[in-house]
């Protein structure tokens, strides 16, 4: 059973902007409306399941569904109805090999559909992402540690080469722990069994195909939408038990860019680039 749980660690690594150790997660994120931008809300549901082949080898299966809502109070000089509701659907298929008590190797393939789906599913909606990871963990010693090294390719990032995934975790005191790396850093205070407080710095973002290209000023066409943010935040987590919890996060975007892109992924229109408050809340069944 312990090996089965360990395989779940980072089985949802979908791209260089996403890490998750969750079996189930239900999450809501919002960036409220400002004078220079519309409000954005995102709902996510994911589920993952490892299938045991033998004591050392597992198949990983999973799926994620996300809905992105833009408020319908248009502030732009073009018809932006195509952007009101966007959807992302991921399927995960992976393989995990437990080399020994400390080392585990994982490979993950993630087909993705990301679009407004105005005209059903089109080939431009499809992307194929993959990740490979090496995980070294020593969670039984007095000061537990975990190191994750890997590469992840995501067509939506616009880079033609895999991007690095680096994460190091250490619980250096019964009440204190930290995690440093890309794409997330955290510093946690564990108050008794049920309450955890944290400060976090994280990356977030996505790319979605826009069917029915949007006609823009200067005769440009918007064929896709990308959002990337760097967020500094404080959070609270209520732990029902070791693996089940409710959580919330509140902060501010330190960097934020929303862009319309043409068929070659070149930026053709800036939707917003100023900072905004950032709220996230959810429920998860995880490993740690």
Regions found by a protein language model. Give the residues of each.
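Transmembrane beta-strands of outer-membrane beta-barrel pores
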Residues: 28-34, 65-71, 97, 111-117, ...
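Transmembrane beta-barrel domains of bacterial outer-membrane proteins
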Residues: 21-119
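Residue-level signature of outer-membrane beta-barrel architecture
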Residues: 49-53, 97, 134-138, 170, ...
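Outer-membrane beta-barrel translocator/channel fold
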Residues: 63-89, 183-266, 272, 277-279
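Outer-membrane beta-barrel "beta-signal"
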Residues: 166-169, 273-288
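Membrane-embedded beta-strand positions of outer-membrane beta-barrel proteins
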Residues: 24-26, 61-63, 107-109, 147-149, ...
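Repeated loop/turn-to-beta-strand initiation elements of outer-membrane beta-barrel proteins
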Residues: 55-60, 102-105, 139-147, 175-178, ...
């Amino acid at each position: 059973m312990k090996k089965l749980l360990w395989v779940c660690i980072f089985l949802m690594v979908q791209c260089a902007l996403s890490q998750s150790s969750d079996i189930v997660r239900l999450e809501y994120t919002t960036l409220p409306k400002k004078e220079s931008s519309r409000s954005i809300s995102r709902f996510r549901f994911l589920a993952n399941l490892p299938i045991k082949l033998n004591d050392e080898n597992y198949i990983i299966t999973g799926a994620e569904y996300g809905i992105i809502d833009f408020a319908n109070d248009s502030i732009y000089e073009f018809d932006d109805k195509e952007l009101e509701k966007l959807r992302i659907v991921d399927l995960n298929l992976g393989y995990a090999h437990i080399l020994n008590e400390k080392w585990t190797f994982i490979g993950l393939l993630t087909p993705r559909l990301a679009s407004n789906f105005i005209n059903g599913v089109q080939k431009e909606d499809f992307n194929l992402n993959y990740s490979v990871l090496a995980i070294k963990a020593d969670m039984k010693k007095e000061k537990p540690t975990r190191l994750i090294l890997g590469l992840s390719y995501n067509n939506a990032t616009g880079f033609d080469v895999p991007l690095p995934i680096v994460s190091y975790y250490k619980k250096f005191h019964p009440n204190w722990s930290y995690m440093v790396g890309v794409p997330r850093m955290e510093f946690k205070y564990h108050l008794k069994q049920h309450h955890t407080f944290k400060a976090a710095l994280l990356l977030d973002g996505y790319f979605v195909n826009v069917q029915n290209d949007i006609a823009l000023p200067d005769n440009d066409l918007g064929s896709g939408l990308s959002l990337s943010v760097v967020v500094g935040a404080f959070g609270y987590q209520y732990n029902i038990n070791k693996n089940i919890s409710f959580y919330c996060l509140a902060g501010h975007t330190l960097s934020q860019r929303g862009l319309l892109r043409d068929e070659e992924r070149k930026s053709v229109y800036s939707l917003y680039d100023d900072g905004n408050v950032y709220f996230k809340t959810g429920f998860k069944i995880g490993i740690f």
